[in-house]
Amino acid sequence: MLGNTELLLRILADVPPAGIVEGAYLFAQTEPNQQSVFVAGRELIERERVHKLLISDCRPKSGYIGAVAYRRAMIESGIPAGVIEEVPMEPTEILHTQIESQRVVRFAEAQGYRRLIVVSSPFHQERAFITMVTAALRQYPSLKLYSVPGAPQPWDEVVTHSQGTLQGTRAELIAEEQKRIEKYTIQGDLLPRQTILQYLRARD
């Protein structure tokens, strides 16, 4: 239990890497939650922490408004167009956290990335980071991943999540996220939390 608490705190308050990182991946969000990752991404660019903000190239599906609209919304939120880069994920019938993570790690390896920042909405950040680390350890273990949660939004606001099929307050979605972490770990889709914690302890 203590290990789980340490992992969660490390994910939510990760020590930022030195220098400028090659890129930060902004996980696909449903529209009510996307501003959270846009704010975090804009701050990373303004503080010169990353060169690129990566997004999924998918068309609208699974609650994601699609790359064209996502890019437009990012620019409207103050992010320079030139820093946005799409990660190939099509063709895919659906879009979910594991698909995003596997394709992003593949992209990072192809581009020669050594480091990558992972950004998602706060209630999804733990599962997003665990999934990305799982993909990296299985596909590209030398990749160093860092966690930067999205900006907080009202916890009691009712929103959609999980491919646009789940609805509840952001606070209620915390429990749903924990259920998914447990389920996908048992299935073998995610590495155990202790393995992720060991990765973070050894990363730097």
Regions found by a protein language model. Name each.
Residues P91, S162-T165, T169-D204:
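A conserved mid-domain beta-alpha-beta active-site/ligand-binding segment of alpha/beta enzyme cores
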Residues M1-H161:
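A structural signal for short, hydrophobic/glycine-enriched beta-strand patches
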